[in-house]
């Protein structure tokens, strides 16, 4: 890691011998637990948590996606005043992409669930998921579920980008399962911690950009750079510093700001960081060129992973919302 990028914390330590590009589910689960222990307790204050998430993103982008989901699940339990299953690896499966999601109703002590979950990250890897179930009256409840044996469809993931996040599709039809309800109906979307969670994701994006920058620095040493490449490196350094500053500023506001301002702060973080990350990716592609992207597996994987990951940010929707606030 270059001293030029020490505005961000260093990467965390991976388990010895961990294969970034060919790990199995068991190895990934162990790596999630290993990294989560370094991130620390879910109740940490935001400025401390953001530093850990920046370091996490700098470590490995697909793994960071999974660890961030685990940490988010533990924070949700903490906000609800409920307890997670001890030593379980968690995820949050709450995507409603293209009007998907699970409907559910109680039948005795069991829940009956139907529907489609897209982007179920960690499918086949994690032990438990926090999943919103939508009720007949339009409200929702958040359920803590054992998802370790749920079947999933991996054929729909057609890209190598983020493939090791194992974000697969799950289809359920009248699936009976035991579950623990987390919070009251409406808790998941209505809790004060919902929007701040997006700032945590932004910190992982910023850390992921630092990983890309580290790899680019190794691929194109200073003594071999053209003037144009040197300019691009300067732009990368500036955008990394900006992204880190945005994350840290928003983290401070999470601790001191009014609850009503949390959505604005989190949206500013996501929008500001995503813009920096996209520019870093553009500069990285320009510096590396076809040869660098074709021949350096670590670099090209990191670029592709981060491009897809930050692609979940809807820049136009967030800009429209921010522009409409007085």
PLM feature spans:
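Glycine-rich flavin
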Residues: 19-126
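DPxDG-like acidic metal-binding loop motif
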Residues: 116-155
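C-terminal helix-coil-helix/basic helical segment that borders enzyme active sites and/or dimer interfaces
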Residues: 13-23, 242-274, 282-296
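Generic structural signal for well-ordered, non-transmembrane alpha-helical segments
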Residues: 207, 234-241, 267, 271-278, ...
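Flexible, small-/acidic-enriched active-site or ligand-binding loops
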Residues: 149-176, 185-190
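A glycine-rich, basic-preceded beta-loop-alpha segment at the flavin cofactor/substrate interface
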Residues: 173-198, 212-226, 248-251
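Glycine-rich phosphate/cofactor-binding loops in nucleotide/flavin-utilizing enzymes
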Residues: 290-326
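Extended amphipathic alpha-helical segments enriched in small hydrophobics
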Residues: 203-257
């Amino acid at each position: 890691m270059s001293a030029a990028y020490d505005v961000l914390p260093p990467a965390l330590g991976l388990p010895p011998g961990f294969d970034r590009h060919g790990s199995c589910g068991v190895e990934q689960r162990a790596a999630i637990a290993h990294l989560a222990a370094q991130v620390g307790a879910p109740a940490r204050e935001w400025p401390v948590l953001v530093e850990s998430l920046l370091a996490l993103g700098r470590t490995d982008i697909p793994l960071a996606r999974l660890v961030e989901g685990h940490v988010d699940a533990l924070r949700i339990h903490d906000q609800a005043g409920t307890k997670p299953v001890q030593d379980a690896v968690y995820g949050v499966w709450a995507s409603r992409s293209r009007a998907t999601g699970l409907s559910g109703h109680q039948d005795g002590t069991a829940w009956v669930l139907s529907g489609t979950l897209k982007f179920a990250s960690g499918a086949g890897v994690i032990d438990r998921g926090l999943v919103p179930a939508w009720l007949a009256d339009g409200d929702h409840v958040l359920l803590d579920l054992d998802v370790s044996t749920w079947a999933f469809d991996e054929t729909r993931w057609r890209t190598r980008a983020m493939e090791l996040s194992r974000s697969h599709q799950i289809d359920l039809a009248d699936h009976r399962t035991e579950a623990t309800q987390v919070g009251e109906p409406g808790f998941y979307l209505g809790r004060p911690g919902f929007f701040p969670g997006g700032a945590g994701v932004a910190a992982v994006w910023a850390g992921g950009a630092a990983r890309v920058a580290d790899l680019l620095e190794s691929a194109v040493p200073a003594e071999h750079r053209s003037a144009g490449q040197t300019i691009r490196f300067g732009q990368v350094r500036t955008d990394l510093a900006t992204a880190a500053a945005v994350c840290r500023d928003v983290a401070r506001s999470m601790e001191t700001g009014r609850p009503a301002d949390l959505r604005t702060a989190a949206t500013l973080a996501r929008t500001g960081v995503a813009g920096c990350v996209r520019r870093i990716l553009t500069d990285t592609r320009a510096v590396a060129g076809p040869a660098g992207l074709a021949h350096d597996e670590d670099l090209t994987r990191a670029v592709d992973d981060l491009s897809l990951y930050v692609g979940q940010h809807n820049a136009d929707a967030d800009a429209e919302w921010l522009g409409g606030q007085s």
